[in-house]
Amino acid sequence: MNKKTDHRRQEVQQIVKNACDQLNSEGVDARNYVEQLAWLFFLKAFDEAETSKEAEAGFDDKAYERRLSGEFAWSSWAKNTDHPDDMLEFVDGKLWIKLTSPDPKKGMGDDALAQRFRRIFDNVRNYSRRGVSFAKVVQQVDKLHFSDQTDVIVLSEIYEDLLKRVAADSAGYAGEFYTQRHIIRAMVQVVQ
């Protein structure tokens, strides 16, 4: 491993630790902040994939219609950290409706991708209740780059460690913890 990769590994570890600490300071336990981070990571990664597809289409002089565009794109709402209460209100209200509503006027439509999003976001929730805290977590997640191989490898290692922490913190639960199948399937399908 070279120095640049090792340095980025440490940065990514610190980013995730900061996000976890922020969620923990709000009273969110390990089991719930793993879920919280998973859906935030997913939206950030999806936005990066959309940006990449948009750029590729531009090179071919073709139009690309983003599935989460305008105010619904991570690259738009996640930058609103100067107004954290507005950001949290937007995510809990408008964005969540966009991600979960089967109504084509309110949601993403009724095609396969929209149905995948609904399956994911119908089964998770936003545990942040304070705008300032939520904005700090979003700022940390925004520092990650899912198009960077080092970030993805380190995040997968960190995710495994977080799952171990959840297992250790959850004395009442037995067995191993796994990422829910619908989340794995959706992530694979979106990436493909």
Cite the ranges covered by each PLM segment:
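Non-catalytic, mostly N-terminal accessory regions of nucleic-acid modification and defense proteins
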Residues: 1-191
